A protein has these predicted regions:
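Surface-exposed repetitive/solenoidal architectures
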Residues: 265-680
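Sec-type signal peptide cleavage vicinity
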Residues: 2-9, 19-269
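Hydrophobic alpha-helical segments of integral membrane proteins
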Residues: 14-18
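Alpha-helical interaction segments
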Residues: 10-11, 148, 655-659
Length: 680
């Protein structure tokens, strides 16, 4: 068979007014030419050129009002598909003829025509996407139609979409609309098998966004009882409305309805929520106001972009999170660089993390900006399938330059079982820190990741940070329990930090319990410390100033060839230049078991340098600088003398230490049972 050319229709829509109403879709008129080699097909748009049907969405019958009609325009195009081949047909200027070459003309099977030609074609599937709707009016290129032809000479088009013309109420006239988001409970992908081996996939996009109130909205066909959720942001507030269909939405029909918007106070976030830009300009004087769950979703979409560095955000309401959470700023190369002021508000609920984000899990993944004055009461769980899995309630990874200031947590942090050879860092506030963490309080239990039976696995858990790699953690308090977990190589749990590298820990206290892991998958080395679980290695240079442990520390179990290290201040230290200044342990210590060597004293196992330290009891690991104290009794001359001697030692230390290493604390008796640090 010779190649056949078709002259067919396709059209760009033009808006017109008419009083007619016709629900028929298309009536083509076919006139083959004399040769039989080509055909001229004349086709009419829905209703023989008359408007789409108009039906009021909330009413019972057909409304009497102008409707939308369509006509063809020069240059219009559509595609024809057959047997995984497709060709484009174009309308000739000044005529009703459309030219193109039929795909696979000598093959068998029906032809599928899809308007407009921009529809994505994948094999026999034509994909329809309504997400590019604009608010300015009707976008004719989204009036999707299809036609089926057995012989390639006659194409009778049918509509794939319906049209909604909404009328919005409830927004004060003095307010300016900045964004509109519409979501539907219809699936984002809904296939329609229009004929054998030819499928239309209506990928409408679950969420559709506009920059102003839309005049028209294209809709997928929907059944009775389906919901359309409208979220509108203005320069002053956020409004919402939910529309439930009282009749089925049919393709090829125009619907009208009134959308009665009300101020939105939704504070509960869940997966699939639409994103709405908040009120504000992102400046220090006029920050973006995170006032509801829609604004929180919006922050996830912009928080990691470099163009938003230095922007200001302020939370103005308590919010709730539930379900799987994609953190804010998930790229290590594009961390959050703004200033987020929690404004002493609380985010509560629960967060679960998929393996896509377990390199850094938290409200924020990667932070290089400032997060302050935020209260977290969120239980978080995650499986660290990534090596170096990092998880904390506020941030998974606080990078260099990042600051987390005056934040609190009351939620639990729990790692899930992982069979891989990985390293995990879990903290009540931050998983992995290279920046500044200051004035934070953790009141939620932290339990390390169960790393399973694979060689090389490490598990670290800390009340404030999982791994304090560098930077400074200061003025922080942990009152909750910290529990180590199983890992073949090493497990470490610390009241403030699970592990410390070349970093500074300043003015921190711990009141909760620290418990080393016992059970299956006992590690070779198991460390538990009231303040720090373990120092990284012999290259670490760390400084610990004015830190006190008041809580019980219980050693765990190790393999028979390994060791357990239990310390009131630190479980194990191997740093080449470590200094503990004005630190103390007042907590009860319980030695670990099963190891070849089990260490248990105020400073666990390792090499230490200490100045003006005290312990409650007889156990200590330093040859000098340690003072054994009893509880505060005015008649105890030995304890009073010890306080004076320790303060003298601090004064001597300050006269020789580098400026950055000077200690700002002195010991004094208070009404408490034990001596306190002044200035802490």
């Amino acid at each position: 068979m010779k190649s056949i050319k078709n002259y067919l229709l396709s059209g760009l829509l033009v808006i017109a007014a008419s009083a007619c109403s016709n629900e028929e879709l298309m009536q083509p008129e076919v006139t083959p030419d004399a040769t039989g080699e080509t055909v001229t097909v004349k086709a009419y748009l829905p209703g023989n050129g008359t408007p789409l049907s108009r039906v009021a969405l909330e009413a019972g019958g057909t409304a009497e009002a102008p409707t939308v009609s369509v006509s063809w325009k020069d240059g219009d195009k559509f595609s024809v598909i057959r047997n995984r081949q497709n060709e484009t047909f174009t309308k000739a200027d000044g005529t009703n003829e459309f030219a193109g070459t039929l795909p696979d003309a000598e093959g068998s099977g029906n032809y599928l025509a899809v308007y407009p030609a921009k529809s994505k074609l994948i094999g026999q599937v034509a994909s329809v996407d309504l997400s590019s709707q604009a608010a300015g009016g009707l976008n004719p290129n989204l009036t999707y139609m299809y036609a089926i032809s057995a012989d390639g000479k006659t194409f009778e088009f049918n509509h794939l979409t319906a049209l909604l013309k909404p009328s919005f109420t409830g927004i004060p006239s003095e307010e300016t609309v900045s964004s509109v988001a519409i979501s539907s409970d219809e699936p984002t992908d809904k296939d329609q098998d229009v004929m054998n081996n030819n499928t239309i996939r209506r990928a409408y996009g679950y969420n559709i966004s506009f920059t102003a109130l839309p005049t028209y909205i294209y809709l997928p066909p929907m059944g009775v009882g389906k919901k359309l959720v409208f979220i509108v942001a203005t320069n002053k507030d956020t409004y919402s409305a939910t529309l439930t269909t009282k009749k089925a939405i049919e393709a090829g029909k125009l619907y009208t309805t009134t959308i009665a918007l009300e101020k939105s106070a939704r504070t509960d976030w869940e997966p699939g929520l639409v994103s709405v830009q908040p009120v504000g300009e992102g400046t220090e004087k006029n920050p973006y106001l995170i006032a509801n769950a829609y604004n929180l979703e919006w922050l996830k979409t912009v928080g990691g972009y470099a163009s938003n560095a230095g922007k200001f955000y302020k939370q103005t309401a308590d919010l709730t999170i539930s379900g799987e959470w994609k953190p804010i700023a998930t790229s290590t190369s594009n961390p959050f660089k703004g200033i987020y002021d929690g404004n002493d508000m609380t985010i509560s609920g629960s967060m679960e993390f998929s393996s896509s984000y377990d390199g850094a899990c938290g409200l924020f993944s990667y932070n290089a900006g400032t997060i302050k004055n935020l209260n977290m009461d969120v239980d978080i769980t995650g499986r660290t399938t990534n090596n170096l899995g990092r998880m904390g309630t506020v941030a998974g990874y606080n990078q260099e330059g990042g600051q987390i200031i005056n934040c609190t947590n009351q939620g639990t942090v729990t790692g899930q079982y992982n069979s891989g050879s990985n390293i995990s860092y879990l903290g009540g506030i931050v998983g992995y820190n290279k920046g500044t963490v200051k004035g934070c309080i953790n009141e939620g239990a932290v339990t390390g990741v169960q790393q399973g039976s694979t060689s090389g696995s490490h598990s670290y858990a800390g009340g404030i940070v999982g791994y304090h790699a560098s930077g400074i953690v200061s003025g922080c308090t942990n009152t909750a329990s910290v529990n180590g977990n199983g890992a073949v190589a090493l497990s470490a749990a610390g009241g403030i930090a699970g592990m410390i590298g070349s970093a500074t820990l300043d003015g921190c206290t711990k009141h909760g319990t620290v418990t080393g892991y016992s059970g299956d998958y006992c590690p070779s080395n198991n460390c538990a410390g009231g303040i720090i679980g373990r120092a990284y290695d012999v290259e670490s240079v760390f400084l610990v100033l004015g830190c006190i442990n008041y809580g019980q520390v219980t050693g765990g179990e190790s393999q028979n060839t390994g060791y357990t290290s239990t310390g009131g201040v630190i479980g194990e230290a191997g740093g080449s230049s470590t200094a503990f200044v004005a630190c103390a342990n007042a907590g009860m210590l319980t030695v670990g078991t099963k190891g070849k060597n089990n260490y248990c004293n105020a400073f666990g196992r390792g090499s230490f340098n200490g100045v003006a330290l005290w312990v409650a009891g007889d156990e200590y690991a330093l040859s000098s600088g340690i003072y054994t104290l009893v509880k505060n009794e005015s008649t105890d001359a030995n304890s009073t003398a010890a306080i004076s001697a320790m303060n003298a030692a601090i004064s001597t230390y300050n006269s020789t230490a580098e400026e950055a290493k000077k200690c700002n604390y002195t010991w004094e008796w208070t009404s408490d049972e034990w001596p306190a640090l002044k200035n802490l």
